[in-house]
Amino acid sequence: MTKKLHIKTWGCQMNEYDSSKMADLLDATHGYQLTEVAEEADVLLLNTCSIREKAQEKVFHQLGRWKLLKEKNPDLIIGVGGCVASQEGDHIRQRAHYVDIIFGPQTLHRLPEMINSVRGDRSPVVDISFPEIEKFDRLPEPRAEGPTAFVSIMEGCNKYCTYCVVPYTRGEEVSRPSDDILFEIAQLAAQGVREVNLLGQNVNAWRGENYDGTTGSFADLLRLVAAIDGIDRIRFTTSHPIEFTDDIIEVYRDTPELVSFLHLPVQSGADRVLNLMGRTHTALEYKAIIRKLRAARPDIQISSDFIVGFPGETTQDFEQTMKLIADVNFDMSYSFIFSARPGTPAADMVDDVPEEEKKQRLYILQERINQQAMAWSRRMLGTVQRILVEGTSRKSIMELSGRTENNRVVNFEGTPEMIGKFVDVEITDVYTNSLRGKVVRTEDEMGLRVAETPESVIARTRKENEIGVGFYQP
C-alpha cells in the first residue's frame, strides 16, 4: 500500500523550495507520495514561518487540528519544521506533546533518519542545529515541475536587522559552491526548465567557492547561469541594498537572460527609521542604486518591502517613505504593519504608533503602489511581451496562461504544445490582476538555445563512415 505524505507550507519562497526538497527526499528514501488531503497521510509535516504576527499561535492552532487525526491513528507521525521550529525548539512539544519530530531549516535532510527513529522506538526527535551547507549534499537530484524552478544558492543572513528573526532561525550566511548550483540548474534545464529563480535570504551576498578554489561573486554566478543552454530567464530574490554592487548592475547591461524586474526591499524612506531598523543604508543610497540600474536597463521595474508603524515612526517619517515610493515609482510591494518578533531587538522598543494610525498608513501606502502598478500595466497595452507559458489559465480551461518578465500574468488563446515554451503576445486588455493578449510569435521563430541531454546530442550528431564506424560530427 502506498505511503502518503502531507506537507503544509507557510511563508517565503525558500520555505516552498525546502518543502519540495522534503517531498523529493522522502519519496526517494521511503516511497512517500504527496497528498493534498491530511486525513490520508501517514506523515504530516508543517513547514513554518515566523515573519508574520502571531506565528507561534498559528502553528499551535494547526497542530490542534492534526491532534484529532493522531487520536484516530496513533501511528501517524507529525513533524514541525521551518523558522518557528528553529525558534521554539522543544517548547513546541511542551505545548503539543503529540508532535514527533521538530527540525530546523538546516536539518530537513535528516528527516529520513528522524522518521526511522520515531518508527523504531516511538521516541520524539528534536534537531534544530545549524550544520552549515550539509543539507544540500544529502538531497536527491532535482525534479522539474513545469518550466520554472527555484534553486537555493545560499542560506542565512548576517545583517541582523532589528525586526528580523532570520539570522536566529536560519543562521548566518553560507554559500553553496558554484559547481553544485550550476549542476542542479543544468539538470533542471535538461528536464525542460526555462526559468530559474535563485533563492537566498540575502541572495546577492552569495560568495561561493569555484572549481579552482577561488571565490566567485554573485555577478559571476549570474553570468554562468545565463550560459546554460535552455535557461532563458533568470530571477533572484531576496536582495539587500548594501550588497547591490556595481558588478551586479553591469550584468543587467550585458545579460538579457536576467529579467527586467527586481525585488529590492527598502522597508522605509526615512533615514532615521532605517537606522532604528539596522538597515545600514540610507534612502539616498537606495535611490542611487535604482538610478544606476535604470541607466543600465531603462525598462527595469522595481518592487520592494515596506514596514509601516515601526517603533518611533513619525508622520514626517511616513511622508518620506511616500516620497521615496513616488521617486522610485515602484511597480508593486509587500507591505505590512510592524509587529514585534520575539527575541529581536525591535521587540524591546516602545511600540508607540497607535494601531489605527498604522492601519491608515498601510492603506495609503498600498493604494499609492496599486495606482503605480496599474499605470505600469497600462503602459504595456499594445506592446508585445515575451511570455513563458506555464499552463492552462485559471480563468478558462480553453486558454493558456504565463508570465511576463515583470511578473504580470497574461491569459491568451493557444495550443497545448505551447506549454513550457516562450511565445510573444501582444497585450490587448489590462485588468487589475492580469493582462490579456494574442499570440504573434511562437518559440520556433525566436532562435532560442534549447537544452539537450547528452543522449539526444549523440543521437543527433553521430555519423557512421563507409564501414559502419561511428564518429562525432558537431
Swiss-Prot record:
PROSITE patterns: MTTASE_N, MTTASE_RADICAL, RADICAL_SAM, TRAM. Residues 143-375 form the Radical SAM core domain. It holds the Pfam family Radical_SAM. It is found in: Cytoplasm. The keyword Metal-binding applies. [4Fe-4S] cluster 2 binds at C157, C161, C164. GO terms for molecular function: 4 iron, 4 sulfur cluster binding; metal ion binding; N6-isopentenyladenosine methylthiotransferase activity. It comes from the Bacteria. Binds 2 [4Fe-4S] clusters. One cluster is coordinated with 3 cysteines and an exchangeable S-adenosyl-L-methionine. Residues 378-441 form the TRAM domain. It is an enzyme of class 2 (transferase). Residues 3-120 form the MTTase N-terminal domain. Keywords: 4Fe-4S, Cytoplasm, Iron, Iron-sulfur, Metal-binding, S-adenosyl-L-methionine, Transferase, tRNA processing. InterPro entries: Elp3/MiaA/NifB-like_rSAM (IPR006638), Methylthiotransferase (IPR005839), Methylthiotransferase_CS (IPR020612), Methylthiotransferase_N (IPR013848), Methylthiotransferase_N_sf (IPR038135), MiaB_methiolase (IPR006463), rSAM (IPR007197), rSAM_horseshoe (IPR023404). Catalyzes the methylthiolation of N6-(dimethylallyl)adenosine (i(6)A), leading to the formation of 2-methylthio-N6-(dimethylallyl)adenosine (ms(2)i(6)A) at position 37 in tRNAs that read codons beginning with uridine. Belongs to the methylthiotransferase family. MiaB subfamily. This is tRNA-2-methylthio-N(6)-dimethylallyladenosine synthase. It comes from Citrobacter koseri (strain ATCC BAA-895 / CDC 4225-83 / SGSC4696). The gene is miaB.
